Amino acid sequence: MQVILKEKVENLGVLGDIVNVKPGYARNFLIPFGKAVQATQANIKAFEAQKAELEKAEKARFEAAVAVADAIKDKVYTIAAQAGEGGKLFGSVGTAEVAEAVSNQSGKKVEKSQVRMPEGVIRSVGEFEFTVHVYTDVDADIKVNVVAAEA
C-alpha cells in the first residue's frame, strides 16, 4: 500500500515521501495516528496544497524538541530510593521514575516512553547514564544519581 508521510517516521521516510508499506502497518498505525494518508490522486493534490504548513508545523515541533533536549542534557538528576545494606535497592528504578525526576528537576515534560534504558532497570545505588529520545533525531544524554533514601 502506498502512503504519503505527513511527518518524519523513523526507518521509513520524511515529510512528503510516498512510500510502500504493508497494508496492516498503514491501517493500524500510520493512518490512525495521523502520520500518513493513503496515496490517492486526490490526496496527493491535497497534500501538495498543505505541504508548506505541514513543514512549518514539523519545524516548530523539531525546534521545541531541541529546546527541551538542550534544557535537560548534560545534567545529573537525583533519585532517592529505599536501599538496604551494600547499596541494593528494595525494588527498582525504572523509566517512569527517571522521567518523573527529570520532569520535576528540570521543569520540562519528559514521558517515560522517551527514556532509553539499555541496561534495564536500576537495582542499586550509584550514577547511571541514559538517553532521552525527545523527538526523531533529537536525543539528550543525562546522568541519574540514585541515592539511598533517608529513613
Swiss-Prot record:
Keyword Protease: no
GO CC aspect terms: ribonucleoprotein complex; ribosome
NCBIfam families (alphabetical): L9 (TIGR00158)
PANTHER family with a match to the protein in the record: 50S RIBOSOMAL PROTEIN L9
Matching HAMAP family: Ribosomal_bL9
Similarity annotation: Belongs to the bacterial ribosomal protein bL9 family.
Protein name, per record: Large ribosomal subunit protein bL9
